């Protein structure tokens, strides 16, 4: 997910996206803990996407 795509979304859409990413991160962490996760790079991608969304929410709150 690109930051440019996220900047076009509204605050409500960003909050929804954040919830989806947090759920996905939880599921990936559970898979990793049980040894079922084959693509460990997804954890890093999701973590960075969460940071992108949170950063944009902070920017929009200040503006």
Swiss-Prot record:
Swiss-Prot/TrEMBL keywords: Ribonucleoprotein, Ribosomal protein
GO MF annotation, one: structural constituent of ribosome
Disulfide bonds: none
GO cellular component assignments: cytosolic large ribosomal subunit
InterPro entries xrefs: Ribosomal_protein_uL29, Ribosomal_uL29, Ribosomal_uL29_CS, Ribosomal_uL29_sf
PROSITE patterns to which the protein is assigned, alphabetical: RIBOSOMAL_L29
Keyword Ribosomal protein among UniProt keywords: yes
Family stated for the protein in its record: Belongs to the universal ribosomal protein uL29 family.
Protein name: Large ribosomal subunit protein uL29
Organism of provenance: Proteus mirabilis (strain HI4320)
The gene coding this protein: rpmC
């Amino acid at each position: 997910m690109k930051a440019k795509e996220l900047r076009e979304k509204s605050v409500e859409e960003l909050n929804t996206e954040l919830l989806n990413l947090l759920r996905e991160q939880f599921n990936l962490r559970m898979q990793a803990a049980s040894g079922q996760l084959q693509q460990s790079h997804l954890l890093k991608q999701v973590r960075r996407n969460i940071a992108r969304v949170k950063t944009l929410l902070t920017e929009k709150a200040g503006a």
